[in-house]
Swiss-Prot record:
The protein's name: Biosynthetic peptidoglycan transglycosylase
Record-linked InterPro entries: Glyco_trans_51, Lysozyme-like_dom_sf, PBP_transglycosylase, Pep_trsgly
Transmembrane segment boundaries: 29-49
A Pfam family it matches: Transgly
Membrane topology listed for this record: Single-pass membrane protein
GO cellular component: peptidoglycan-based cell wall; plasma membrane
Pathway(s): Cell wall biogenesis; peptidoglycan biosynthesis
Record keywords, A-Z: Cell inner membrane, Cell membrane, Cell shape, Cell wall biogenesis/degradation, Glycosyltransferase, Membrane, Peptidoglycan synthesis, Transferase, Transmembrane, Transmembrane helix
Subcellular localization: Cell inner membrane
Native source organism of the sequence: Rhizobium johnstonii (strain DSM 114642 / LMG 32736 / 3841)
Reactions listed under catalytic activity: [GlcNAc-(1->4)-Mur2Ac(oyl-L-Ala-gamma-D-Glu-L-Lys-D-Ala-D-Ala)](n)-di-trans,octa-cis-undecaprenyl diphosphate + beta-D-GlcNAc-(1->4)-Mur2Ac(oyl-L-Ala-gamma-D-Glu-L-Lys-D-Ala-D-Ala)-di-trans,octa-cis-undecaprenyl diphosphate = [GlcNAc-(1->4)-Mur2Ac(oyl-L-Ala-gamma-D-Glu-L-Lys-D-Ala-D-Ala)](n+1)-di-trans,octa-cis-undecaprenyl diphosphate + di-trans,octa-cis-undecaprenyl diphosphate + H(+)
Length: 245
């Protein structure tokens, strides 16, 4: 009479063992996902330290693929103010006034998307910085959902000066060219501190597509766009007070 229960227990043991093993694997997966999601927020706090020079995911990719890259970190004090003016007027005119996300612009972007219309970029400098530091290129709702809270946190934790300094030192300005110092030397053979207003505007308008837009050898369309940004930058005094006041 006792044989059947013993056989049943012996049959159940492998199933129980597999269940516990599967549960351990699931726990490890959940833990790994949580670490991946939380780590960027810890790094943002770490980047408060002025002597820390962050690298972007694209720079890490180039290292993994053994391509190498050129990036020479410079402080904001060693970057010509015309660069900041031009980049802000080209990429994020409301940089000093929003909290990481320009919600009015984002709302219009969503409305255009729902209507099936061609959309503008809509990414602020904090959003671009968060993407460059922690995420991947390419448009997707998943990336945008991860990018928004990272941008808000980045803008909240870091000062506007520190955030701009990081952005200008990790932005891509050509294949394997990262940061404003490497870009200035590569395209114009001068340090970032010596860039002219025209050169700064050319670098600024190449940011959305640095592989195809060559600031050092601009086409007619790029020169025309740079002229627009150059004029805006000349009247940008009220827009850059969070950086230089």
């Amino acid at each position: 009479m006792d044989i059947a229960p013993e056989r049943e227990d012996s049959v159940d043991m492998p199933a129980r063992r597999r269940w516990f093993e599967d549960r351990r694997v699931l726990k490890r997966i959940v833990l790994a996902v949580l670490i991946v999601l939380i780590l960027p927020y810890a790094l943002i706090v770490f980047y408060l330290l002025p002597f820390i020079h962050p690298v972007s995911t694209l720079m890490l990719r180039d290292l993994v693929l053994l391509r190498g890259y050129d990036r020479q970190w410079v402080s904001l004090d060693n970057i010509a103010p015309v660069v900041v003016q031009s980049v802000m007027m080209s990429e994020d005119g409301q940089y000093c006034f929003h909290g990481g996300v320009d919600w009015a612009e984002m709302r219009m972007l969503v409305e255009d998307t729902l209507k099936g219309q061609a959309t503008r970029g809509g990414s602020t400098i904090p959003m671009q910085t968060a993407k460059n530091l922690f995420l991947w290129n390419g448009r997707s709702f998943v990336r945008k959902a991860l990018e928004l809270p990272l941008a808000v946190t980045t803008d909240f934790v870091l000062s506007k000066r520190r955030l701009m300094e990081i952005y200008l030192n990790i932005a891509e300005w050509g294949p394997g060219i990262y940061g404003i110092e490497a870009a200035a030397r590569h395209h114009f053979k001068v340090p970032a501190s010596k860039l002219t207003r025209r050169q700064a505007s050319l670098l600024a308008v190449s940011l959305p597509n640095p592989i195809d837009r060559n600031a050092g050898k601009p086409g007619r369309g790029l020169r025309r766009l740079a002229g627009v940004i150059e004029r805006r930058a000349q009247g940008s005094g009220d827009y850059i007070k969070c950086i230089y006041d």
